[in-house]
């Protein structure tokens, strides 16, 4: 089942390997600042 980070507890993670996928594809302005 799909969970968000806020749904996880220590018991969910204890003794397990965790893979975190992060989407860093965000729009940037000409000064390289996130615009949205």
From Swiss-Prot:
Could you identify this protein by its name? Phosphoglycerate kinase, chloroplastic
GO BP of this protein: glycolytic process; reductive pentose-phosphate cycle; rhythmic process
Write down the top EC class of this protein: transferase
Family classification? Belongs to the phosphoglycerate kinase family.
Q: What is its EC number?
A: 2.7.2.3
Keyword set, alphabetical order = ATP-binding, Biological rhythms, Calvin cycle, Chloroplast, Kinase, Nucleotide-binding, Plastid, Transferase
Give the Gene Ontology MF terms in alphabetical order. ATP binding; phosphoglycerate kinase activity
Q: Does the keyword Nucleotide-binding apply?
A: yes
Q: What catalytic activity does the UniProt entry give for this protein?
A: (2R)-3-phosphoglycerate + ATP = (2R)-3-phospho-glyceroyl phosphate + ADP
An example of a Gene Ontology cellular component annotation for this protein is: chloroplast
Localization recorded for this chain is: Plastid, Chloroplast
- Describe, as the record does, how this protein assembles with itself and its partners: Monomer.
**Requisite cofactors:** Mg(2+)
Annotated (2R)-3-phosphoglycerate binding lies at: 22-23, 25
Q: In which pathway does this enzyme or protein participate? A: Carbohydrate biosynthesis; Calvin cycle
